[in-house]
From Swiss-Prot:
Its main location: cytoplasm. Homotetramer, a dimer of dimers. One homotetramer interacts with 1 SecA dimer. Disulfide bonds: none annotated. One of the proteins required for the normal export of preproteins out of the cell cytoplasm. It is a molecular chaperone that binds to a subset of precursor proteins, maintaining them in a translocation-competent state. It also specifically binds to its receptor SecA. One of its GO terms (biological process) is protein folding. One of its GO terms (molecular function) is unfolded protein binding. NCBIfam families: PRK05751.1-4 (NF004393), secB (TIGR00809). It comes from Pseudomonas fluorescens (strain SBW25). Keywords: Chaperone, Cytoplasm, Protein transport, Translocation, Transport. InterPro entries: SecB, SecB-like_sf. This is Protein-export protein SecB.
C-alpha cells in the first residue's frame, strides 16, 4: 500500500486513538530538613504546580508530558519537594485541529494523571513522609481556561 492509500484508509475508518506507552520521564525528591523534620509536629501545607506539554513525534505519534511538582512545608520549613514527569506516547489520527488540540491538552493528561499521582505518592512514602493523596484534576476545565486566555490574547493555538 502507498502512503496515500494508508492515509485514505485511516480517514475511511474515522478518528483513531491509541496509547502506545506510559513512562516516567523524570523523577526527583528532596527532603532538605531530614532527619530533624521527622521529630517535629506534622502540620503540613501543600503547594502543587501542574504543567503539561506535548511534542509531535514521527508520523501520527505524539508525546505528552504531565509534570506534577509538590512542595510541602511543615510550618515555615520545607519538608520535601517532589516532582514527577509522567509521559505517554499516543498514536492519534484523523482529528481536526481543534479536536487534536483538546485531545493533547486535556484527554491525554487525564490518562496520565493517575499514574503520576501514584508515582508521586510512592516517592513521598518512600521518603518516610505520610501519603500524599492528590485530588482528581479536571483537565477539561483547565484546557478551557487556557483556551479562553489564549483567545483573549489573540492566539488560536493552545500550548
Amino acid at each position: 500500500m502507498t502512503d496515500q492509500q494508508n492515509t485514505e484508509a485511516a480517514e475511511a475508518q474515522g478518528p483513531q486513538f491509541s496509547l502506545q506507552r506510559i513512562y516516567v520521564r523524570d523523577l526527583s525528591f528532596e527532603a532538605p530538613k531530614s532527619p530533624a523534620i521527622f521529630r517535629q509536629e506534622w502540620t503540613p501545607s501543600v503547594a502543587l504546580d501542574l504543567n503539561t506539554r506535548q511534542k509531535a513525534l514521527e508520523g501520527d505519534f505524539h508525546e505528552v508530558v504531565l509534570t506534577l511538582s509538590v512542595t510541602v512545608k511543615n510550618g515555615e520549613e520545607v519538608a520535601f519537594i517532589a516532582e514527577v514527569q509522567q509521559a505517554g506516547i499516543f498514536l492519534i489520527q484523523g482529528l481536526d485541529e481543534a479536536s487534536m488540540s483538546h485531545t493533547l491538552g486535556a484527554f491525554c493528561p487525564n490518562i496520565l494523571f493517575p499514574y503520576a499521582r501514584e508515582t508521586l505518592d510512592s516517592l513521598v512514602t518512600r521518603g518516610s513522609f505520610p501519603a500524599l493523596m492528590l485530588a482528581p484534576v479536571n483537565f477539561d476545565a483547565l484546557y478551557a481556561q487556557e483556551l479562553q486566555r489564549m483567545q483573549q490574547e489573540g492566539s488560536s493555538t493552545v500550548q
